[in-house]
A protein has these predicted regions:
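Cytosolic-side junction of a single-pass transmembrane alpha-helix
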Residues: 26-40
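Short, conserved phosphate/pyrophosphate- and ester-handling motifs at nucleotide-, phospho-/glycolipid
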Residues: 81, 163, 257
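A short, basic/flexible loop-to-alpha-helix module at the beginning of a structural domain
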Residues: 140-151
Length: 289
């Protein structure tokens, strides 16, 4: 395809003949056509490679990885609430793990992954060792949950550790969408204060939400000056910091370590919520990522 520079070069010698206004009009039409060519680059079957362009350490064991898309106007093409598969060949075997980007499709030209590195985590360690310019292979979208504006009057979200990523994506999308009135509440549990991921971003969303989004942190090992929740997430915390259960068709979304999720199932059962399925479906009132 001809570039903008090539088009200008071709038009320049003839500008006097066809008129500067006409040349400008052609250039404007060309640029408009280019903008319409915004592409969604994900493929559910074919693995595609994307280059690492930056790495920002959020904590001692967690980083935000930014990968470039092929063109500045490209978007990933990921429905809100879904995730991607990341693959790598490790010790002669292809290893695949799922991650939810923290970027939305209106973030053009790149996508971001927030990943915690585990000592025995194959893909997380692989990502941590990537250098700028190296590539990863991904495909997608994957997942059963797709967020749409006003799909429920309230979303009650409980997250632990890196389980924050699908919640953050949903919260960010909801608050940026005109006409979406969904009430959003998040209980976010971690071990220590330094483990709280995307804290600045979450608090910025809360502060600009006109009280539509509430945020409550819980720490297992809090500092002496801590004013949030202490220990593990309890039934009382859910009752006190989630929207009132009488709002109607509210939904509960959960993502976190298995022991935490097991405990949350018990709390929710006591509060009258149905038991989640092993593999959650979009229509479920309690959805596990």
């Amino acid at each position: 395809m001809i570039s903008v520079g090539e088009l200008v070069e071709k038009l320049s010698p003839h500008a006097g003949a066809i008129g500067g206004v006409f040349a400008a009009l052609l250039l404007g039409l060309f640029l408009a056509f280019q903008r319409k060519e915004d592409r969604k680059v994900l493929d559910p079957v074919e693995w595609r490679s994307f280059k690492l362009v930056s790495k920002d350490h959020l904590s001692h064991n967690t980083a935000l990885y930014r990968f470039a898309l092929p063109r500045p106007n490209d978007s990933l093409g990921l429905p809100i609430g879904q995730h991607i598969s990341v693959a790598a060949e490790i010790d002669g075997k292809q290893i695949v793990r799922s991650y939810t980007p923290t970027t939305l499709d209106n973030d053009k030209g790149h996508f971001d992954l927030v990943v915690k590195t585990y000592e025995k985590g194959n893909i997380s360690r692989y990502l941590s060792l990537l250098t700028i310019g190296q590539e990863v292979r991904i495909k997608g979208p994957k997942g059963k949950f797709v967020y749409t504006p006003n799909m429920s009057p309230a979303l009650l979200m409980i997250a632990g550790g890196t389980g924050i990523t699908p919640m953050y994506q949903i919260i960010k999308s909801s608050l940026q969408t005109p006409g979406d009135a969904t009430k959003l509440s998040l209980i976010y549990a971690n071990v220590e204060e330094d483990d709280i991921l995307l804290r600045k971003e979450l608090e910025s969303l809360r502060d600009s939400s006109n009280s539509r989004f509430t945020l409550y942190y819980v720490l297992n090992k809090p500092p002496s000056s801590w004013n949030g929740g202490v220990g593990f997430v309890t039934k009382d915390m859910i009752e006190n910091h989630m929207p009132a259960k009488d709002v109607g068709d509210e939904r509960v979304l959960m993502c976190g370590p298995p022991p935490m999720i097991s405990a949350m199932k018990g709390h929710l059962a006591q509060l009258g919520y149905p038991a989640p399925r092993t593999v959650s479906k979009l229509e479920d009132q309690v959805f596990l990522f």
